[in-house]
UniProtKB/Swiss-Prot annotation:
Signal peptide: 1-29
GO biological process: glucose metabolic process
Organism: Conus imperialis (Imperial cone)
Name of the protein in its database record: Con-Ins Im2
Subunit field text: Heterodimer of A and B chains; disulfide-linked.
Propeptide: 64-110
A GO MF label: hormone activity
């Protein structure tokens, strides 16, 4: 069974406009930015908001409704120096911390698993420049 395109111009135009409308709707329903290893390797955006500044700003913006605080909590690290954990023979093989962490995938909602790149507040506001309205999306 061969697939044929509609021959009449109004039907084809309607089909193309419908596909365009569906594509535009998909853009508005997702995150505005996606970060890949290349994005992260360039570092923070010159106008990006990162680290504690990002946590403080979201905390102030979301005060009436609150926000999900575990986005900003730092995992506790061991108190021993790194030399006690690393064999001296492996020093030339190991990656630096930033590069090694770039290979770890953050926990993502099931709906976004399997997509290329990562998304989230750090991607949107640190590695890219986010707007006031994008920040408000992280409030409860």
């Amino acid at each position: 069974m061969a697939l044929t395109w509609p021959s009449s111009p109004p039907v084809l135009l309607t089909l193309l406009l419908s596909l365009l409308a569906l594509q535009l709707c998909a853009v508005y329903g997702s995150y505005e930015h996606t970060c890949t290893l290349a994005t992260r390797s360039r570092g923070a955006h010159p106008s990006g908001i990162c680290g504690r500044n990002l946590a403080r700003i979201v905390s102030v913006l979301c005060t009436p409704r609150g926000y999900v605080s575990n986005w900003f909590t730092k995992r506790s690290a061991p108190n021993k120096p790194a030399e006690t954990f690393v064999d001296q023979n492996l020093r030339g093989v190991l990656l630096n911390k930033r590069e090694a962490l770039s290979y770890l995938r953050p926990r993502e909602p099931r709906a976004t698993r399997g997509t290329f790149g990562s998304q989230g507040i750090t991607c949107e506001c640190c590695f890219n420049q986010c707007t006031y309205y994008e920040l408000l999306q992280y409030c409860n």
